[in-house]
A protein has these predicted regions:
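Two-component histidine phosphotransfer core
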Residues: 1-154, 159-163
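C-terminal coupling/interaction segments
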Residues: 166-168
Length: 168
């Protein structure tokens, strides 16, 4: 159960997320820092519902661009959401790792999202795949010919990994 303070904080966080989605979605680009703040808020909100058996690690520390790097808004959220949707199992220990690095000398951004892989069961009939299509559409629209996207399973299928490199 949540305390009133936790509930208030969660509602404020949700409000920030919704404002970002509504107002920044129309922009061609946002600062990388703004996009990172959005991801951090999303991760913090999602942590509230997770059991202690789930490890969530983020590393956004290396992202210091002084507002000089811009990305398409909401470009990474589908992959982060997928990690929380598919990377958690109530029956076993699970993990999610998210990292963003920006190298100004190479003018390169690297986004990595990894999670424990819990394949869908035959009972899970929820539709899927739209998030990955949206990521590809955003990459093609915003960075035609200037990105690499690798995704799939690693460690004998135990880990799902997605890595995007964007060249500015």
């Amino acid at each position: 159960a949540f305390s009133p303070q936790q509930a208030q904080g969660a509602i404020e966080e949700l409000s920030r997320l919704l404002r970002y989605v509504l107002y920044e979605n129309e922009a061609e680009t946002v600062t990388l820092e703004k996009e990172i703040e959005f991801l951090e808020s999303y991760v913090e909100l999602m942590r509230l519902r997770l059991p202690s058996s789930v490890s969530v690690e983020t590393n956004f520390d290396a992202v210091k661009t002084d507002g000089q790097a811009f990305v398409a808004p909401l470009i990474f959220i589908s992959l982060v959401e997928n990690a929380f949707k598919h990377g958690i199992s109530p029956a076993s220990r699970s993990f999610i790792r998210i990292r963003v690095d920006y190298d100004s000398s190479k003018r390169q951004l690297v986004f990595v999202c990894q999670n424990s892989n819990h394949p869908k069961t035959s009972k899970d009939k929820s539709p899927g795949g739209i998030g990955l299509k949206q990521v590809l559409q955003r990459l093609e629209h915003s960075y035609p010919g200037r990105y690499e996207w690798l995704y799939g399973t690693e460690n004998d299928g135990a880990t799902y990994s997605s890595q995007i490199k964007i060249y500015f």
